[in-house]
Amino acid sequence: MEFIDNIRYKKIKNAVGRAVADFGLIRDGDRIAVAVSGGKDSYTLLHILEGLRRRAPVKYELVAVTIDSGYPGFRSDVIASYLREQGFAHHLETTDHYDIIREKRRPGSSYCSICARLKRGVLYTLAQKLGCNKLALGHHLDDFVETLLLNQFFVGTLKAMAPRMLADNGETTVIRPLVYVEEREIIPFARENRFPVVCCSCPVCGTADLQRRRMKKLLTELEKENPAVKRSLLRALGNVQPRYLLDLELQRLCDVP
């Protein structure tokens, strides 16, 4: 694919390249399943990883994977057609998640948490089925810092996301190469390159995850005083000083008498 905004493309690609190097996300011989939901983030991730692959000093393979959870109106055919036109290997997995969620969901709860857990399980299984040792997800910098704030404000933990971690199945390594890329860089990139964005078609999409939207709003307000606040929060995740925290295990590790 020939990108409209070459400068923006290079900026995002360089940021992903730094993340790959900093966190050891990709190694020679990797076969990577890239989760493509039909959103701007996953399309961007797939194209950037392909751009890096063509010039990388190591050899790796990409396989795009999409899960159709059975939500009425979800246009998985649009995703499949686009990826086929772009020359990507693509696997579409159809599930009955929508029916399961409607049956199991507690009254008043959102679809999001159940849906996410079900999708994760399928993605891990798919990665193994397709011979992939890694699964790439499209979480960007904003997702990392919003998750950090959500866990601090509502859960009481110092926890965000990891750019590289072993999945629950103990077999697949999950990577998040967009960790250094802000959402505001992805939005115009996706728009200018006319990615065929497909909404998830969830019946409560847009009303769920209100707490995350509150974090987005808070960060937007903070940026008015400190434009670098999101990157500062991200740096904090890699600049931990255990002796100044309250975790008792960390205190023992620091040999505090």
Curated annotation (Swiss-Prot):
Binds 1 [4Fe-4S] cluster per subunit. The cluster is chelated by three Cys residues, the fourth Fe has a free coordination site that may bind a sulfur atom transferred from the persulfide of IscS. GO terms for molecular function: 4 iron, 4 sulfur cluster binding; ATP binding; metal ion binding; sulfurtransferase activity; tRNA binding. CDD domains: TtcA-like (cd24138). Pathway: tRNA modification. It comes from the Bacteria. The keyword Zinc does not apply. Its cofactor is Mg(2+); [4Fe-4S] cluster. It is found in: Cytoplasm. Its EC number is 2.8.1.-. Keywords: 4Fe-4S, ATP-binding, Cytoplasm, Iron, Iron-sulfur, Magnesium, Metal-binding, Nucleotide-binding, RNA-binding, Transferase, tRNA processing, tRNA-binding. It catalyses: cytidine(32) in tRNA + S-sulfanyl-L-cysteinyl-[cysteine desulfurase] + AH2 + ATP = 2-thiocytidine(32) in tRNA + L-cysteinyl-[cysteine desulfurase] + A + AMP + diphosphate + H(+). Catalyzes the ATP-dependent 2-thiolation of cytidine in position 32 of tRNA, to form 2-thiocytidine (s(2)C32). The sulfur atoms are provided by the cysteine/cysteine desulfurase (IscS) system. The thiolation reaction likely consists of two steps: a first activation step by ATP to form an adenylated intermediate of the target base of tRNA, and a second nucleophilic substitution step of the sulfur (S) atom supplied by the hydrosulfide attached to the Fe-S cluster. Homodimer. NCBIfam families: PRK10696.1. This is tRNA-cytidine(32) 2-sulfurtransferase. It comes from Geobacter sulfurreducens (strain ATCC 51573 / DSM 12127 / PCA).
